[in-house]
């Protein structure tokens, strides 16, 4: 969140407008809906699956488009080519959180994005033993983010940097296993009598299957699904697991599971969660190696 807040606050001022989607990570949603209005920054939520809805939301004060490559936790896949083109057409800065895809599966800068943000805590590190954020992209924009990071206190300590560098050395070895395992579990869950729906880019039944083949063809180590019986059934399911641990975070070598309604998206209003696809019984899994 330090990387996200430092980057966005370095680019936005009172009176500016940003277009994003309600499907984003709960912490980012909170930043944009709770803090940005206090700073006089307007935010419009559009449909991540419909670039034309982003274009319709643009006004004379719009400064920036913000999306996630693969959304947390519903795993909707953004058409980054279309979004980058839209931003360039309207002279806007384009920013994408690429955490769920990682640089192994998707390179948004090559698609035309100005800035790419990663949670270093997750797959880049891969060992669940640090918290970090990364932003890469245009040098002129990075300079402002670096200055904001310094002034806002989001600086990384040397030990954390060492651990992150260590983890990134094995990213390309780990990710094929993460994605293969998550694809297999998604396949087995699909059609199970206790499951309402499964979200994973590898499934032909998934709404963004075709977009995913173009944007992030290697996939992701994440998956999500809904259990019949609502949130209580989902919690019983989670607590009956013996190998997969109930815990927040994701992207480590171990497998973790949570219910977003009481973790990552607990402060997102229920109606917003439902509209985003976080229905009763919704479960998010990070599949390890």
Language-model segments: residues:
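Conserved PLP-enzyme active-site core in the AAT-like
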Residues: 1-194, 199, 210
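Conserved C-terminal alpha-helix-loop-beta "cap" of PLP-dependent enzymes
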Residues: 195-283, 287
